[in-house]
Amino acid sequence: MELALYLLPVTLGDTPIETVLPPYNKEIILGIRHFIVEDVRSARRFLKKVDKGIDIDALTFYTLNKHTSPEDISGYLKPLVEGQPMGVISEAGCPAVADPGADVVAIAQRKNLRVVPLVGPSSIILSVMGSGFNGQSFAFHGYLPIEPAERALSLIHI
């Protein structure tokens, strides 16, 4: 296994792991002991889906959300700098795409650390695939706000 920050896609919903993630992903995941995650509980659940025998208590989790400072993120990467592979796990789908994982990737790249995205489901790409629209001119403007007034404003600006 190469030394890198691995971007680990997560299944969407209750989809069985083996129907959407290649065996290579499982191999990589089982070689990682340090994970930067959006939510520790859901990350632990995902890892147990990957391998029921995984020793969750032997793993280290670093929480990443909109409140995590760049300084904290930089510190999270210490195991990688010291020679241990790390993984980034989002709530669902691909980390770093319309996701706080993008901040981790940017900081890792500034530190000249290797970043390896793994194959997996992306709600954004799946929606384009199923839409019938031409993917050549696709543009993603981000997820719309939940608050109705903010959402209306966002739609006007688009």
Which residue ranges define each predicted feature?
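Conserved small/polar residues in nucleotide/adenosyl-binding loops
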Residues: 156-158
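Structural signal for short hydrophobic segments within the conserved structured cores
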Residues: 6, 62, 116, 139-142
